[in-house]
Amino acid sequence: HLDSAAGVAGFIKTVLSLHHRTLVPTVHFTTPSPRIDWDSSPFYVNAETRAWETDRLPLRAGVSAFGIGGTNAHVVLEEAPPRVHGQSDSGPRVVPLSARSPEALRAAVRRLADHLEAHPGLPLDDVAGTLQLGREAFRHRAALVASDTGEARELLAAGDPTHLVIGDAGEPVDGYVFLFPGGGAQYLGMARDLHRRYPAFRQEVDRGLDLLREREGVDLRPIWFAEPDDAAANDAFQRPSVQLPALFILEMGLARHLMRWGFEPTALIGHSLGENTAACLAGVVNYEDALGLVALRGRLFDDAAPGGMLSVTADPDTVRARLGPTLDLAAVNGPEQCTVSGPREAIDALAAKLDSEGIDARVVPIDIAAHSSLVEPLLEPFEAYLRSLELHPPQIPFLSNRTGTWITDDEATDPAYWAAHL
């Protein structure tokens, strides 16, 4: 008798029988008991090895355990579904390892290299997935990025620190903060590889692209995924009605993708347009309405007086002292990081002046003067659209561009706040 482990042997035997789809004979069985009316019963004692077949799939079996202390238990087992070897997306995979000591970690690296050497046909997806999800993470860790099993084996065997990163785990983080950029961060082909390799990310991005085409009549695909040397596409990507929806769709796609991987944000912050993305992710406005808002923002900027923006590495007082009457200090992004907005000629003149003084200043690749007096005529139609939307208190806290502190429920649900945000 297995005492408190009663039933374990039968459990293991039954799991193996299901796996091999084979019924094995009962140990030491010779003659059925005459005290049981076998002929009137559906039960029998199996006395020979035979295939376990049935038309009623899946196979199931019951295992009873009668503990020596009087415990009675019954477990019903069912065969696992057939393993499907689908065609996974090509691309790099993270292969992690961990151990309780540096010596054990080095041994784990060697064992994995030997295992991949002995089983070259193993899909890297399976190897990476098992190590990511099926192993406890200890303090001493190693990780590499590889595109196939052969490359992973070579990197493990070589132990090159430029490819095999080894170190100790830091203290657990309390959470993650997602940061969303604003207009000017766009470039042709952004996230093209992610779009090709990850179906869930592609589905999220395509959802936004399809919605924009259906509701606004704007098809971003030929522009977004154009080659970097496509001059016409580059010019088109400077238009606010093109770049702003593209950035919003990408930012939401990346955020959702990270959240699927387990990176749940505990706080958000967005720069300019990025605060619209933060509001959407925080639940202030739904996806469809947020995309419509961003599309309107882009159209209004298209029709606004032409202008530009300048990113300046200097403190606010230094920047203010150099502003002419037509320029505005649009944003104070940090102690020595400011953004200036205004007419293009004045922006170019200020950039030249700052360069002559040795102050770093870079023109933002956008053809509008956001957050300046030039956008005041846009506020009324923008706020009118906002008043047609249903706004909710944020479910994830995010920082306000306008106050520099956490946005309040009243601010987040006030159309006037978002109109002044322009």
Where on the chain are the PLM-derived regions?
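Acyl-CoA/ACP chain-elongation machinery
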Residues: H1-Y44, F66, S88-P96, E103-R106, ...
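Flexible catalytic loop/linker elements that gate and position reactive groups at enzyme active sites
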Residues: I36, Y44, T54, L59-Y176, ...
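Acyltransferase
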Residues: H1, A137, A304, S311, ...
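Electropositive phosphate-/nucleotide-binding environments in soluble metabolic enzymes
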Residues: A5-A9, A99-R110, G121, A146-G150, ...
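Short acidic (Asp/Glu) and glycine-rich catalytic loops that position anionic groups and cofactors
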Residues: L23, H28, F43, H85-P92, ...
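Conserved, well-structured core segments
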Residues: G10-L16, S64, A142-L144, F178, ...
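FabD-like malonyl-/acyl-CoA
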Residues: A99, I166-R322, N333, D360-A369, ...
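Predominant activation on well-ordered alpha-helical scaffold segments within soluble catalytic domains
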Residues: V8-L16, N46, H74, E78, ...
